Amino acid sequence: MAGLSNSQIPDGEFTAVVYRLIRDSRYSEAVQLLSAELQRSSRSRAGLSLLAYCYYRLQEFELAAECYEQLSQMHPELEQYRLYQAQALYKACLYPEATRVAFLLDNPTFYSRVLRLQAAIKYSEGDLPGARSLVEQLLSGEAGEDSGGENDPDGLVNMGCLLYKEGHYEAACSKFFAALQASGYQPDVSYNLALACYSNRHYAPALKHIANIIERGIRQHPELGVGMTTEGIDVRSVGNTVVLHQTALVEAFNLKAAIEYQLRNYEAAQEALTDMPPRAEEELDPVTLHNQALMNMDAKPTEGFEKLQFLLQQNPFPPETFGNLLLLYCKYEYFDLAADVLAENAHLTYKFLTPYLYDFLDAMITCQTAPEEAFIKLDGLAGMLTEQLRRLTKQVQEARHNRDDEVVIKAVNEYDETLEKYIPVLMAQAKIYWNLENYPMVEKIFRKSVEFCNDHDVWKLNVAHVLFMQENKYKEAIGFYEPIVKKNYDNILSVSAIVLANLCVSYIMTSQNEEAEELMRKIEKEEEQLSYGDPDKKIYHLCIVNLVIGTLYCAKGNYDFGISRVIKSLEPYHKKLGTDTWYYAKRCFLSLLENMSKHTIMLRDSVIQECVQFLEHCEIFGRNIPAVIEQPLEEERMHIGKNTVTYESRQLKALIYEIIGWNM
């Protein structure tokens, strides 16, 4: 509905209309009317005051600050305008400007409010000692009657926030809990408590507090449309309203997503983000945008990079943004971009990167041009972390001997955190030799770390892979692959298809064909059950297992059986043909064509005919399937008509005809 214009409002009704709009939270319309009115009467105190209020409610804090600045200049005797200006500047994250305005306030009436504001500014700037000094001043009662005391809910929350920033999560939890008991349920305080529990790795109580926030938000504000997007219901944006902010629903869903992500429940993490009240992308807060980028990175990497790059230009941005963008550049092997971002943002390096993360990124970037130097850097980092792990192991043993449960829990948590730092360093070292196909050296690196990593799933998986690649250690590879598969046997499709395929090949190569067949029957059974619920869903596990087995026979020179296995594995084509499965299939065909062109093998006409028919089927079903998933930030894109399974299958068919001398 179009907004009212000033000319449509009857004489004498302007003020009433504006107040009605504000009462109904229609602040944008009120801003239009007030702005037009102020063009005619620019020194209207009432008009400017209402406009500032509307801007503040719309979270246009800089514009609100400008209005309050005008008011304080027009009425210097009314110091509350200067206070409101300082508060608006603080909300706009303009901390130096907010501090400057706050220092101009010397009215005793506002003393405690100014102290609170100054403490909040110092806290946001990272000056924790300065913030603590001001908070303690408030708690002592020095700031007047309304400054509160030790049991004042605001004071408890402030102390809780300081303790949280200082890393004292247990003590912070106690303060937030006491604040809730003193004031009753407050969504923002409940969120603070959940966040402190999360940071202390107490995920169950954190999720309990989050569930309470969400449940109350849904019950009290059904109009916010919680869960609608996940259910596929098309709903309009609820906007960034004050009500939404007061419910702490956005913060709660973001924290829930972070916990599920930490627990490797990636689907649940994505669902938490889509469950939150719907907003347009341009309305999203920085934390939600950051989390969306991370959790959809596998499916939409280009969008993910764009969002993180955008956030880096904002003030403020989530502190994790800088490190995560650099790590993702390294993951996707954009080392030059990572180096450029580090060089261009030296001021952010010291603020947002720990010494460990900086050294790790430096080594990863060095890998591209000087792998030997990178290995030495990583080795130094690994040595430092192994020393920490040994020290923490000793601490845990001593604490258990002394039956000090609190120290045990703290040391175990610290050990787990250090191990999570050590694993990426170890894998980066191993990858240097993996890229050189020096698998015995990779195995040697892993064996050196067995003391700390023998229970870590990532380590076990990579040990299995390196044993498998050596082709004479299939039995040892089974010893590492089997526990991974058995651990998830009741949900076998949650296991990576390549793990299942490598285990099957290892069984075959060690003459354990019955075990291989049993595993394949189990995969087939689960795929059938899944297809009953969703007949159109593409499931590739059994297909990839058969493709890898077919590849094995082709590698051994048995192309008749190997190629037939590859062809059968992709039936039916509409469900089995995809970018990954085509990758395995075309490798076998290229190997076959290479050997045919060298006249090292001869194929029966029936097999050649089978190959041609297979490629014709791929041509039909592969029109909309990319042959290659391009890198997300690739400047020169492949021709859209060439990057399809259809195009590549035609090329392979033409090569077959050329080699055997058939006329097309």
From Swiss-Prot:
Cysteine disulfide links: none
Q: Is DNA damage given among the entry's keywords?
A: no
The superkingdom listed in its UniProt entry is Eukaryota
Which residues does UniProt call coiled coil? 507-534
Keywords (A to Z) from UniProt = Cell projection, Cilium, Cilium biogenesis/degradation, Coiled coil, Repeat, TPR repeat
Instruction: Tell me the GO BP annotations in alphabetical order.
Output: intraciliary transport
State the InterPro entries in the record: TPR-like_helical_dom_sf, TPR_rpt, TT30
Q: Where are the TPR repeats?
A: 11-44, 45-78, 153-186, 188-220, 395-423, 424-456, 458-491, 543-576
Per UniProt, subcellular location reads as: Cell projection, Cilium
> Which GO cellular component term is one of those annotated?
intraciliary transport particle B
The family database entries (PANTHER family) matched by this protein are listed as:
INTRAFLAGELLAR TRANSPORT PROTEIN 70A2, TETRATRICOPEPTIDE REPEAT PROTEIN 30
Quaternary structure, per UniProt, is: Interacts wit the IFT B complex component IFT52.
Q: Which family does it belong to?
A: Belongs to the TTC30/dfy-1/fleer family.
UniProt function note: Required for polyglutamylation of axonemal tubulin. Plays a role in anterograde intraflagellar transport (IFT), the process by which cilia precursors are transported from the base of the cilium to the site of their incorporation at the tip.
What's this protein's name? Intraflagellar transport protein 70A2
Q: Which organism is it from?
A: Mus musculus
